[in-house]
Amino acid sequence: MTKEQAPRASGEKEEGCPPEYIVFDEERGEYICTLTGEVVEETVIDTGPEWRAYTPEERTRRSRVGSPLTHTLPDYGILTTISGYRDANGRKLEARLRIEASRLRRLQAKLRATTSIEKNIEQAAREITRLVEALNLPRGIIDTAMMIYRQAAEKGLVRGRSLESMAAAAVYAACRIRGIPRSIDDIAEVVKGGRKEVARCYRLIVRELKLRMPIVDPVRYVSRIVSALRLSPAVERRAAEILVQARKMGLTAGKDPAGLAAAAIYIAALELGERRTQKEIAAAAGVTEVTVRNRYKELVQKLNIPLPAQ
């Protein structure tokens, strides 16, 4: 291992390791940055079950320490929560004890988030969960988005800014990191702040947290847009061919992948006689008509695509 490749010692911890480079080493119980070799977090308890389980009862009995750690809670979910309905043996509580347990649960919720940052993170967790469910995204996006939001909160980036917009920006960043094909317009549709504010917060997060965003292949957007427009598999295949050709010629770098996918679908639909308007395609892709029109002109000209008379 060369000097440049050697992992940093734990005492030389570098702040702000990009989330997409953080992996969990199950054997050592550590979160490690694959970019620098830095141990981001150590002595993490392995929270999964020890053996295979085939029934809910077996899973409960064989799990060592309960639920896994989560970024959606200020305390990472380490603390237990008072049950409001059953005792330690699983028996239902009588009415008087249920009322008392409910009061204790409310008190515990207040005590759990003690600082303003923790309270903000708790509110953000609810908003991020709402966004992920509204957009029908994989549940894993919640943890990635919360990791990003938590870093932003700890750096003071959320102060004075809309919690909704910052949460939406974190969700968009998480989608980019995990390769989920969603445009910023898709996400802005389910928040009050609007696209411009979400985009501003996203740029702030990427810049200040020094996130390295992977380039999203526009081909990944094609299937979802084609399905929304009820176009044929032939259109999907042809649009993908156009995008592969565009990538080889260097036409996709720095362009919105959703806009490129929309333009390629528009061209493919024209070629195969399954016409859709630019307005329809833009709406399905979550981009503007202007974006579709500009990318369409560019692809047709640079790739020398002959089109039937419109």
Swiss-Prot record:
> What processes does the entry annotate via GO biological process terms?
transcription preinitiation complex assembly
Keywords, alphabetical: Repeat, Transcription, Transcription regulation
The residues bearing each sequence repeat, given as ranges, are: 126-209, 220-301
HAMAP family per UniProt: TF2B_arch
PANTHER family named in the record: TRANSCRIPTION INITIATION FACTOR IIB, TRANSCRIPTION INITIATION FACTOR IIB-RELATED
The protein's matches in NCBIfam families, at most eight in alphabetical order, are given as:
PRK00423.1 (NF001658)
Task: Give any Gene Ontology cellular component.
Answer: transcription preinitiation complex
**Taxonomic lineage of the native organism:** Archaea, Thermoproteota, Thermoprotei, Desulfurococcales, Pyrodictiaceae
UniProt entry tagged with the keyword Repeat: yes
**Protein name per UniProt:** Transcription initiation factor IIB
According to its UniProt entry, the function of this protein is described as:
Stabilizes TBP binding to an archaeal box-A promoter. Also responsible for recruiting RNA polymerase II to the pre-initiation complex (DNA-TBP-TFIIB).
Native source organism of the sequence: Pyrodictium occultum
Q: Which GO terms describe its molecular function?
A: DNA-binding transcription factor activity; TBP-class protein binding
* SUPFAM superfamilies hit by this protein: Cyclin-like, Zinc beta-ribbon
* Pfam families noted in UniProt: TFIIB (PF00382), Zn_Ribbon_TF (PF08271)
InterPro entries for the chain: Cyclin-like_dom, Cyclin-like_sf, TFIIB, TFIIB_arc, TFIIB_CS, TFIIB_cyclin, Znf_TFIIB
Is Protease included in the keywords of this UniProt record? no
